[in-house]
Amino acid sequence: MSDSPRRFPTPLLLTGVMGVLILIALLTFTLMRSWDNAPDQSALLGKPAPNFSLPLLHDPSLQISNTDLAGAPYLLHVWGSWCAACATEQPVLTHFALSKRVRVIGYNWKDRREDALQWLEQLGNPYLAVVSDPEGKTAMDWGVTAAPTTFLIDGRGIVRWHHKGALNQQIIEHKLLPILADIEHSPTAAPALHQAP
């Protein structure tokens, strides 16, 4: 039996394989960019925010509801002490809250109270108030499936903006602030209520 000589891939075959790999890389890059730039969709956009009445994290004997927040816009920010992305965005959220453009309400989701309080003590508390939903039942009405998730609700109680994922300065400047400005300049908008110092 004679051994046939070993055949090496032809330059044409190598070029074809490289072309396919480049095409796959370009498609992946394009899909990732379109995913990053896709608008945040929520079935709640343009609709009344779901009713809620939840205990305050710092004093569970007190409750806060969406009717308590009516009359002025507020940002409802869903977070958990177990959420790495929440810790990453905390400095950005704190900086935004200091601007006092809108009330920032924390929504502690699927968390133990002790862990959440310790997390706020370590990383800072940018919130006017923090509600607690340890079982995550009320969050289901909002369509929350992950933290962090952020909603902007106008003074009439309508959900105007939704973002799933960590906030950064670019998202705040290019997505959140234009909608907030629209709310502030709307003839039917309630006057903005700023956070307490």
From Swiss-Prot:
GO terms for molecular function: disulfide oxidoreductase activity. The keyword Flavoprotein does not apply. Pfam families: Redoxin (PF08534). It comes from the Bacteria. The keyword Cell membrane applies. Residues 43-181 form the Thioredoxin domain. Disulfide bonds join 83-86. Gene3D superfamilies: Glutaredoxin. Its main location: membrane. Residues 1-11 are cytoplasmic. One of its GO terms (biological process) is cytochrome complex assembly. One of its GO terms (cellular component) is outer membrane-bounded periplasmic space. Residues 33-197 are periplasmic. It is found in: Cell inner membrane. The chain crosses the membrane at residues 12-32. Keywords: Cell inner membrane, Cell membrane, Cytochrome c-type biogenesis, Disulfide bond, Membrane, Redox-active center, Transmembrane, Transmembrane helix. It is a single-pass membrane protein. Signal peptide: none annotated. NCBIfam families: dsbE. Involved in disulfide bond formation. Catalyzes a late, reductive step in the assembly of periplasmic c-type cytochromes, probably the reduction of disulfide bonds of the apocytochrome c to allow covalent linkage with the heme. Possible subunit of a heme lyase. PANTHER family: THIOL:DISULFIDE INTERCHANGE PROTEIN DSBE (PTHR42852:SF6). Belongs to the thioredoxin family. DsbE subfamily. This is Thiol:disulfide interchange protein DsbE.
